[in-house]
Amino acid sequence: MTKLSRRELGRLAAGLMAARAARLEAQPPAPSEYVGPLTGVEKGLEDRRFDPVAYTLDLYAAAPRRLGFQARTRSEAEAWQQQLRSKLTELVGGFPVEHLPLRPMTLETRTFRGYRREKIVFDSRPGVSVLAYLLLPEQARTPSATLICVPGHGRGVDDIVGIDEHGADRTDKAGYQHDFAIQAAEAGMAAVAIEPMAFGCRRDAITARKGLSTSACQPAAGGALLVGQTMIGWRVWDVMRTLDYIATRAELDSSRVGCMGISGGGTVTLFSTALDTRIRAAFVSGYLNTFRDSVGSLSHCIDNYVPGILNWAEMYDVAGLIAPRPLFVESGERDDIFPIRASIESFTRTREIYSVLGVQDRVEQEVFPGEHSFWGKRGLPFLARHLNA
């Protein structure tokens, strides 16, 4: 037998370790099996249940949904909309009676290829201010059709207006939101991209120190619940105040305003358009689903929840409040937090409401070959068509 030198043994050992590491890297980690206080003592517990989501789904099945859509005529549907819109306003915590002066201010104006971008602030309610970017296309006829653009979870509004994590300009439309406010401007529509409360620069000081993508939704949305309100209601009010701001700008046509958003921004878009009829059309990306299959079954941010809503309505009922105004929905077939089957189900139920109102041609869905991300291939032309009509 040939005796190996110490150096050769070292090389052999290193090679074996590298090969083993490569094999481990190539193999997916084995799922860890839960071991807890009930492991090994399951006998006799067959009729016991410890799963809280299963319990929630039992409650879902028993919930009355007192204002679920049942209308058969246009007049019945319109009466139903009035009832549910009033109840939904109550459920999200209501809105201020007084419209505080906006006190708008332009902080910065910059010119880019094809559009001008203004950084603006205005007041929403006492103690609450909103940051937004206004994107004005060079070639748009004025006053211009305008889109209120609401980002989903992540870095906030910068992620939809071409600003990277270092505050520098970018042109590659990176990230899951693909700078969709810029895409709106490139499609010839003005865009007012707002920073949602608890996102980006509108986070609390403690959370902001933890990094750009650290969510502040937990303390803020939790605080809203403690006073009988909701983060959804707060963000919808910001959209309503954005509509007020648009009405102050001569370049913008306040009678041709749409709203669009993805994920958490899709939540805000759906509820805002349902509750404020000044919004003429909506584009909801990566959100329309059922409460049962999304926020009722999967882990989601607390800002998605409206206490008691399932006693009155499902998500498709909320979507039905948008009718007869145009609504476009897009869903990724591999979206893992808003499952596609339930998205299609919810859209089908929404279309039934549009059908009773005689406007089934004003609601569309695109299922695209992707995950939880903005697509926009048909949605943006849909908005342009309806807002420029």
Label each residue range with its predicted role.
Residues M1-M17:
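N-terminal secretory signal peptides and thylakoid transit peptides that target proteins
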Residues G127-V128, E138-T146:
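Proline/glycine-enriched tight loop/beta-turn segments at coil->beta junctions
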